[in-house]
Amino acid sequence: MSRVQLSLNVTDFDAAVAFYSRLFSTQPAKLQPGYANFAIADPPLKLVLNAAGNGPGGTINHLGVEVGSTEEVNSAGDRMAAEGLDTNPAPGTVCCYALQDKVWAHDPDGLPWEYYTVLEHVETP
């Protein structure tokens, strides 16, 4: 299953977790100090909250598409490169309390997008 990811910087982490829990009627799938991710079924969305250390609160940290396998990540990277986009493959990246394979591209304004798959969950950010 693929789903869009929205990663937000938030100034009041606890208030944001409470708000989005109520908004989507679900609790975070992963909750760590300053980091929460919600695996929302309806609408299909991976929502990530980051304590605002990477940018001002209320801003987008980055966007992404979660896919089911490394093959899908590689296929997305190949497709983007064939379309003339600059890509940055990042296999074996530890990020967001998970080991991931991913590929990055940036939109014309510099907004980062990633295609990624989670290989395993880990205890470090």
Give, region by region, the residue ranges found by the protein language model.
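Core segments of cupin and vicinal oxygen chelate
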Residues: S2-K46
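Vicinal oxygen chelate
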Residues: R3-T11, A39, G55-P125, ...
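Short linear motifs in intrinsically disordered
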Residues: S25-K30, G68, P91-C95
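A short linear hydrophobic-aromatic micro-motif
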Residues: Q27, L47-V48, D86-P91
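Conserved beta-strand in the GNAT
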Residues: K46-N50, E114
